[in-house]
Amino acid sequence: MLLFLSVPQPRPPGARTRAGAARLVRWRRRQRLRLLQLRRLRGLLRGLRRRPGTGGRRPSRMALCGQAAGAASLPSELIVHIFSFLPAPDRLRASASCSHWRECLFYPALWPQLRICLRVSPAEQPRLEFLMRKCGWFVRELRVEFAAENYLSGGGGPGDGGSGGGTDTGTGGEDGEALQLSSRWLEVLRIYLELVLCVLLSIRNNRNLQKFSLFGDISVVHQQGSLSSTYLSRVDPDGKKIKQIQQLFEEILSNSRQLKWLSCGFMLEIVTPTSLSSLSNPIANTMEHLSLLDNNIPGNSTLITAVELERFVNLRSLALDFCDFTAEMARVLTDSNHVPLQRLSLLVHNASVMLKSLDNMPNDEHWKALSRKSSSLRVYLMVFDIKSEDMLKILKPSIPLERVHFDSYVTCVSGAIVDLISRQYDKFLTHFILMNDMIDTSGFPDLSDNRNEDPLVLLAWRCTKLTLLAIHGYTVWAHNLIAIARLRGSDLKVLQVTEESIDFDQGELADQDVDPVQNLIEQVSLGLGQSWHAVLDIESLSVFTEPNRHFYREMQSFSEDI
């Protein structure tokens, strides 16, 4: 209300003549009308602040409805202005009370950006269709994440688990469970394709789009082998839907007039090697961010070539599969007509390394040239199950590596690799994540085996800019954890170590006077200068349960932080 009441009031016009007296009457009438509108608006805002069940004298709905409140008579511009100050829940509550207010809910000024996280389920489709029908044609920033529900862990219904006896029953139960699991994934993919089509159809003619981001977390791609030859071919046997999705994506790119941010990660065959050619030269020349990550492209084909990259002269951040980032691309990015690249995110996946060669990757001289071109260049590396010998080829000394995330299912990271990272990237490294999901009855691997010093302690000692350290699935000795906390102190903002990864020396366990767990918590908290405790539930760590999504979101914030 202060915003409206603080407007200076005009002085009444002179009334010395008959015309002046008439002007004075009209002025007073306008002032009375204006005061009445302000009183109505004050009551309306009081009603918005009320919540149901608070015991107010009047329900908030009465302040919004009816002729007494005058809500329907307020101009649309004023309603939109009021909406702009309200949080989303209050905005929806207000719009539900009056048809005139509902009409103003989806004004373009109120929805400059739209960020949607969808479960791949039938219930989401009508909601998505409604929202995209209202906002898809004008929204400037659109980020959509598709999250598949955990169909792999639910098992079957009653009767699937071998409740009867005998060998034949057991075999039949296994076959039935596999069949049910297959039908679940077929349903997931069918709905997924429908949701993607809904999004793309709604924005095909949106020429205001500036940021467009798509993320599809369909884990069946990595867990069940080649999707194209199994599930996807059964859901879309003639390939019509996939072709329609690819054509719509290219149509969006060709129609864009203001696009500066394009990001597509872990989607199913949406981006093709010819998709970027749909971008006009003026748009490609002004693009600031481009990320094309693990889009399930069969064979050894790539989504972007060095020749195509030459058009993106204004690129400030780039995210690609590591095997697609070649020495020729590094040379293109160092050309004088390109602005300095400031953020580079690279995904190293064992599936890509097996299909594509590492022979074309940039050498140390290329990395030196990139660093000379841009002193602020920083690199984010996400590594899935890469052997130590391949990592030794990848980790060139001149990479300005700021973040590294290891996620292992088969191949563990060695202590030698951790030691190499701490020596080569001590001036840059801020984030270090070690995740291991291997099932090994012999226990977690110990990085400090046959070493005088623990590599993790050396990492904390050498890397003075380290702010985040997360570990699961590797043995971390309690005394080493205390040393890490003391070395980095309050500069280490995040220290996440799972309880099952922590081990104690026999001497610490033998001391009857001290509780080793409580002592560890106290010493680490003292070293960090803040309260600390181990992660008790590994399922609460999204970096472990959803590594793809975690990397994609971190890549987005990493690229925006320029």
UniProtKB/Swiss-Prot annotation:
Pathway: Protein modification; protein ubiquitination. The keyword Disulfide bond does not apply. SMART domains: FBOX. It holds the Pfam family F-box-like. It comes from the Eukaryota. It comes from Mus musculus (Mouse). Keywords: Ubl conjugation pathway. PROSITE patterns: FBOX. Residues 155-173 have a biased composition (Gly residues). The keyword Repressor does not apply. Gene3D superfamilies: 1.20.1280.50, Ribonuclease Inhibitor. Part of the SCF (SKP1-CUL1-F-box) E3 ubiquitin-protein ligase complex SCF(FBXO33) formed of CUL1, SKP1, RBX1 and FBXO33. Interacts via its N-terminus with YBX1 CSD domain. Directly interacts with SKP1 and CUL1. This is F-box only protein 33.
